[in-house]
């Protein structure tokens, strides 16, 4: 797809919209660590249960990565990110209303699915809408946003807990996600590939898997990221 470089002011605002979504993704990813004492008391959870809650997020997140690539190429970040974030709202509200460990776990999986496009969606858009000299900077800033989400999942959440409780914190997050969806639908550009026909032959997963360089990076990514998590 040909580049469609956006004016700098519009590009900055688009980055802000995408960054808000990725911030929420990071916040939801790490928040269970802060809430673990409360969840343990309220639901009589074990250490294994808490581990499963963290793993449920990654299960939902990872399960979407392969279909996500096709969906982003075909429909673009605007439709995909906003659609997936609707699932995140469902998962967040379900977590806030959960009455059992199974309810918490299912909600975490839904949240993982819902925020799974919050990084790859923006990176797909930046590739087309941002000039080459801004690509590395935009990627680095997205990682900074990730760290900010982790930070806000600690002390700010602890400050809010005695004020509104953990269930209402998730309700507030659901409202923030809804605002991000509206901003995405209003301001993210339309994906040019949507108006093209199906004559162009797209690559298959077998093409990717048959690439020797790709296969050589799998162990590095698997153990390196797994160790970090």
Q: Which residues make up each language-model segment?
A:
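Juxtamembrane intracellular "pre-TM" segments in multi-pass secondary transporters
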Residues: 2-7, 191-218
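Extracytoplasmic
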Residues: 14-45
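Residue-level signature of mid-helix packing/kink "hotspots" within the transmembrane helices
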Residues: 30, 58-66, 150-151
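Conserved MFS/SLC helix-loop-helix module at the cytosolic interface between two early adjacent transmembrane helices
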Residues: 63-99
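Helix-loop-helix hairpin linking two adjacent transmembrane segments in secondary transporters
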Residues: 141-188
């Amino acid at each position: 797809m040909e580049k469609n470089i956006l004016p700098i002011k519009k590009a900055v605002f688009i980055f802000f919209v995408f960054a808000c979504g990725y911030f929420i993704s990071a916040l939801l990813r790490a928040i269970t660590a802060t809430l673990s004492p409360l969840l343990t008391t309220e639901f009589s959870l074990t250490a294994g249960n808490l581990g499963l809650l963290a793993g449920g997020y990654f299960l939902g997140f990872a399960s979407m990565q392969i279909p996500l690539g096709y969906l982003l190429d075909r429909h673009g970040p605007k439709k995909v990110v906003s659609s997936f974030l609707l699932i995140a709202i469902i998962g967040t509200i379900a977590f806030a209303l959960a009455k059992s460990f199974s309810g918490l776990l299912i909600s975490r999986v839904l949240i993982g699915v819902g925020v799974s496009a919050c990084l790859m969606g923006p990176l797909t858009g930046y590739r087309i809408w941002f000039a080459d000299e801004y690509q590395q900077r935009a990627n680095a800033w997205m990682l900074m946003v990730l760290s900010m989400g982790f930070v806000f999942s600690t002390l700010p959440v602890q400050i809010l807990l005695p004020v509104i409780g953990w269930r209402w914190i998730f309700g507030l997050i659901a409202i923030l996600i809804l605002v991000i969806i509206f901003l995405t639908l209003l301001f993210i550009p339309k994906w040019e590939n949507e108006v093209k026909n199906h004559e162009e032959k797209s690559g298959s997963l077998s093409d990717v898997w048959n690439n020797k360089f790709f296969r050589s990076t799998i162990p590095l990514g698997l153990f390196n990221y797994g160790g970090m998590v």
